[in-house]
């Protein structure tokens, strides 16, 4: 009888200790472990820039190298009124490279022909849209030196670069804007850089040039460059 009482007491003691052990050491479920492991924030790595932020100090060197590997020379501007196809001149390599670079980076998409002077020019590439301004900032702030001694004249239908609004010294050229002549404008020779000509769509240039404008030569109705693409 003594032995039975001893055995019963022993089993009771073991059972109590086992319950206490379970209470003190709760199980950690697999899902909780996985949750803890996955709770760390994913590290976001920003992609490296494909090109440097352009400045007046590095732009010419950049385009000298860029033009070696980007030989495209025919582009298309899709406008509110239709397409304008342009042949870029190989001799004005910095301006050709700049134009190709800007097209590949979608800088002209959504801009406007913001200045129209009847019988003279249509000027494009600008906009008051904040998205356009942001894209410009992402490219950089730089100027291109004029390249006016290649023998190209301001015949009807050439594409040329206006002097810069940033600094007008030496007629440095604004890289984000351009104009197309609607008629012969030889008084511009030697002052602005001709770097291409319209090969198809002069009727579209004429149509844009005929639009009504305000006192500042800005078209009353917006004329968009919906898209600029490379065709060859």
Locate the predicted segments by residue.
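Bacterial Sec-dependent N-terminal signal peptides
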Residues: 1-25
